[in-house]
From Swiss-Prot:
Pfam families: Ribosomal_L30, Ribosomal_L30_N. Residues 18-28 have a biased composition (Low complexity). It comes from the Eukaryota. One of its GO terms (molecular function) is structural constituent of ribosome. This is Large ribosomal subunit protein uL30. PANTHER family: 60S RIBOSOMAL PROTEIN L7, LARGE RIBOSOMAL SUBUNIT PROTEIN UL30. InterPro entries: Ribo_uL30_ferredoxin-like_sf, Ribosomal_uL30, Ribosomal_uL30_CS, Ribosomal_uL30_euk, Ribosomal_uL30_euk_arc, Ribosomal_uL30_ferredoxin-like, Ribosomal_uL30_N_euk. Keywords: Ribonucleoprotein, Ribosomal protein. SUPFAM superfamilies: Ribosomal protein L30p/L7e. The gene is RPL7. One of its GO terms (cellular component) is cytosolic large ribosomal subunit.
């Protein structure tokens, strides 16, 4: 009878290690899958809460306007906390000071746009560059469409499309911002981490307005029939034509 062939001890150890490694990989894969599922559920729950928050705020304004009208008074909206600023003029004939302000606002190219928190300081900056920019108060819809259609993040000085929530989480997760909709919420509410969220966003590259600027003289103030300056809620119409 032939001698029984024994598997060397080293071979047995290697086989057991490989089996353990395969089991560990499978366990880790299952754990990641469960964590991702939980994360997706949390994101959906947050998004639903955001949607409800936006709807509630909108209904409150409508109701307040109705009550004011019924009482024969006028509803005064709260001071806006956010503006969207678009550079509409190139580099020719710009004095050094406003040129520096445009750089500070990250508006280095014509048709580039950025969100700016309204403060006393930023209001002064906008006044200095008013002949070179159009700005106003963006709606939720405008902000959402901008981020989803033209949103890019600044990652290691590179311009990266916000194609996945994981890109946002990897860069802003430490601030509790783990999805594109979290990012939008932080911008629209001018939240506690607005600065970090806004700096993460690469300045938006917009197109020329579809159908042109629609004004006889572009470089006159908006209230005089031109294009530059504060156009308040009318900024939404302009962005829509450039997005």
């Amino acid at each position: 009878m032939a001698d029984k062939i024994l598997t060397p001890e080293s071979q047995l150890k290697k086989s057991k290690a490989q089996q353990k490694s395969a089991e560990q990989v499978a366990a880790e894969r299952a754990a990641r899958k469960a964590a991702n599922k939980e994360k997706r559920a949390a994101i959906l729950e947050r998004n639903a809460a955001y949607h409800k928050e936006y709807e509630t705020a909108e209904r409150a304004v409508i109701q307040a306007k109705r009550e004011a009208k019924a009482n024969g008074s006028y509803y005064v909206e709260s001071q806006p906390k956010l503006v969207f600023v678009i550079r509409i003029k190139g580099i020719n004939k710009i004095a050094p000071k406003p040129r520096k302000v445009l750089q500070l606002l990250r508006l280095n190219q014509i048709n580039s746009g950025v969100f700016v928190k309204v403060t006393k300081a930023t209001t002064e900056l906008l006044r200095l560059v008013e002949p070179y920019v159009a700005y106003g108060y963006p709606s939720y819809s405008t902000i959402r469409q901008l981020v989803y259609k033209r949103g890019y993040g600044k990652i290691n000085k590179q311009r990266i499309a916000l194609s996945e929530n994981s890109i946002v989480e990897a860069n802003l997760g430490k601030y509790g911002i783990i999805s594109v909709d979290d990012l939008i919420h932080e911008i629209i509410t001018v939240g506690p981490h607005f600065k970090q969220a806004n700096n993460f966003l690469w300045p938006f590259k917009l197109s020329n307005p579809s159908g042109g600027w629609g004004v006889p003289r572009k470089f006159k103030h908006f209230i005089q029939g031109g294009a530059f300056g504060n156009r308040e809620e009318f900024i939404n119409k302009l962005v829509k034509s450039m997005n």
